[in-house]
Amino acid sequence: PIELPARPYQTYVSVSIKAKGKGTLFIGAIHKRWSRLELGQFILGGKRYSDENKQEFIHYFHPGDLKPPLNVYFSGYRTAEGFEGYFMMKRMNAPFILIADPRIEGGAFYLGSENYEQAIRKVIQNALDYLGFANNQLILSGLSMGSFGALYYATKLNPAAVIVGKPLINLGTIANNMKLVRPNDFGTSLDILRLNQNDITNKDVVQLDNHFWKQIQHSDLSMTTFAIAYMEHDDYDKYAFQDLLPVLTKQHARVISKRIPGRHNDDSATVTHWFINFYHLIMEERFGRVTHARR
């Protein structure tokens, strides 16, 4: 990275690229980010991972009071690069990890190469090992795009609970819905389809959808509690909850749900309220932690 010192006045930054010779030049995205120099990425203690294809995610670990559970929050779609949910997670006092995906425009749903996905699991497992926790002392959570990260990595980590709001699961269908269901809205979904499948045909839509379902159908989530707040008229992934419930029921997972009227981007305040309520409920019931909000 190129470090530009802060200035007391407004200015512009321009980038020029010069190339000479024969071959193919690939130019990726240019990112402008706050620097903490050697003290962290974005915030003090923040870290960045990049795989062999320069696909990256960022993560931050806070040890809290060193008592279970370890709460992991996957950031939702956001064009402003950085961490999401810091103060919300910190108020719970428990150890937590923030994970964010700054790829494409707003995030690529935490899917990637084998090394990329293994690195996300390793970040979580290393924190569990540091704290001396087992996987049944882990909660994965996220809203919207972050819900996919929580649900997807739950199939690999077998946490105590998964807490999600506005779940998005069928990523191929989300891209396909841009034709008629929500024209010109969330074009990033097409980029995600092409990133993972190299094309945007109907076959690619089905294959990307099936990527998640193959994972969850070959996992054991019988000891995991799922708390899900979903939109009744979701125009991104309308049947996400209806598709997920039979699979979780078959695995004898415990499911707590709240249906909220509206489309995907409606009534975020109510969804967030239920998301936090689910956290308080599970932390008290499973771990004996009574938060200030429930006293």
Residue ranges: model-predicted function:
Residues 9, 91-97, 134, 246-259:
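Structural alpha-beta junctions
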Residues 45-94, 98-105, 228:
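Short, surface-exposed "cap/lid" segments of acyl-processing enzymes
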Residues 110-133:
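Alpha/beta-hydrolase active-site loop
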Residues 155-197:
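Hydrolase active-site cap/lid region
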Residues 132-146:
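Alpha/beta-hydrolase fold nucleophile elbow
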Residues 149-153:
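Hydrolases whose catalytic domains are alpha/beta-hydrolase-1, hotdog thioesterase
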Residues 181-258, 264-294:
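The feature captures the conserved acid-bearing segment of alpha/beta-hydrolase catalytic domains
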